[in-house]
């Protein structure tokens, strides 16, 4: 009788272990295809989501790097699964054009408090009393930021297709700057590197940037550069009519954005564990800034970023495990 009891116990243990493993890995056998933009600094927050999905049993491909509008279309069509870099409201036009809420699952806020705007070097701002972008209607002030000899201010701007590009183009016209300001577009990383080099040479600079990103850790607002305000709120497309004025009365031209995880709606409905994960993950903006600075300082390989992600998980293990437990519970 003792032998039978032990055998029964052993069998029960095996079965329960198997059942636990199945519950533990609700994504087993399912492949996930993440997308992000070509901004390599977005890899950190994307990989953090991928690592969590892998812990749930999903097979997660390396993120595809595409333009934002292509990414949204790919997710809507089911050719990609999710993006962790949906800027809201900056990307509202692209989100709606690709199908909006009918095609996408979007719940929760992954990163909050993302800022954007225009900055100039502090030395020039103080010497010429420049506090607002529309002051560059004055050709004499605009010429201070001329880099190519045409007499216009050369604003280091936003890559085509990022969303901020259309805002900058709109605001240049709205604030009457078409004759005095050039919006320099191309490879932002190369343009901002040139801008920083000019700053270090003591030259006047004007540029657009955003957080989370490393630029504000190199050209520090308040120390090296200052944010410029705008004369009034003016945004294009779906953001038209949005008041960008802050509670303290300052107006930097852009609303504070949240970064959200967007997934294919049909896929999310079939994968409640992943859907729950997408809804509850949260990453502090300051942590992305810190990681992006490490990339700028040379730790920018895929292995480096993987190490950064694993380090973040180790430092926030209880929170990470809590996300996984909630996701597993949603699948039951």
UniProtKB/Swiss-Prot annotation:
Keywords: Amino-acid transport, Periplasm, Signal, Transport. It is found in: Periplasm. Pfam families: OpuAC. GO terms for molecular function: transmembrane transporter activity. Induction: Induced by increased medium osmolality. Repressed by glycine betaine. Residues 1-21 form the signal peptide. One of its GO terms (cellular component) is ATP-binding cassette (ABC) transporter complex. InterPro entries: ABC_Gly_betaine_transp_sub-bd. Disruption phenotype: Uptake of glycine betaine and choline is completely abolished in the ousA-ousB double mutant. GO terms for biological process: amino acid transport. Gene3D superfamilies: Glycine betaine-binding periplasmic protein, domain 2 (3.40.190.100), Periplasmic binding protein-like II (3.40.190.10). The complex is composed of two ATP-binding proteins (OusV), two transmembrane proteins (OusW) and a solute-binding protein (OusX). Part of the OusB ABC transporter complex involved in glycine betaine and choline uptake. Binds glycine betaine. This is Glycine betaine-binding periplasmic protein OusX. It comes from Dickeya dadantii (strain 3937).
């Amino acid at each position: 009788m003792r032998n039978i009891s032990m055998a029964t116990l052993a069998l029960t243990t095996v079965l329960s272990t198997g059942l636990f493993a199945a519950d533990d890995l609700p994504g087993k056998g399912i492949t996930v295809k993440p997308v992000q933009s070509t901004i390599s600094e977005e890899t950190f927050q994307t990989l953090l989501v991928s690592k969590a999905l892998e812990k749930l049993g999903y097979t997660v491909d390396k993120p595809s790097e595409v333009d934002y509008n292509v990414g949204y279309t790919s997710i809507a069509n089911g050719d990609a699964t999710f993006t962790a870099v949906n800027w809201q409201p900056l990307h509202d036009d692209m989100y709606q054009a690709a199908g909006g809420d009918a095609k996408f699952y979007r719940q929760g806020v992954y990163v909050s408090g993302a800022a954007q705007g225009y900055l100039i070097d502090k030395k020039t701002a103080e010497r010429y009393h420049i506090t607002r972008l529309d002051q560059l209607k004055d050709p004499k002030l605009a010429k201070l930021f001329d880099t190519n000899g045409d007499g216009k201010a050369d604003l280091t701007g936003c890559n085509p297709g990022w969303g901020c590009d259309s805002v900058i183009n709109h605001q240049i016209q709205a604030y009457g700057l078409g004759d005095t300001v050039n919006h320099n577009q191309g490879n932002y990383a190369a343009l901002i590197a040139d801008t920083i080099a000019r700053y270090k040479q003591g030259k006047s600079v004007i540029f657009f940037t955003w957080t989370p990103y490393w630029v504000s850790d190199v050209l520090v607002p308040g120390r090296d550069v200052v944010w410029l305000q705008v004369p009034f709120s003016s945004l294009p497309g779906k953001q038209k009519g949005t008041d960008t004025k802050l509670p303290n009365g300052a107006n930097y031209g852009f609303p504070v954005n949240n970064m959200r995880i967007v997934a294919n709606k049909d896929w999310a409905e079939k994968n409640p564990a992943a859907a729950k994960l997408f809804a509850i993950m949260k990453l502090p903006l300051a942590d992305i800034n810190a990681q992006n600075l490490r990339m700028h300082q040379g730790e920018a390989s895929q292995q480096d970023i993987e190490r950064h992600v694993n380090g973040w998980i180790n430092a926030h293990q209880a929170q990470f495990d809590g996300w996984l437990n909630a996701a597993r519970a949603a699948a039951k």
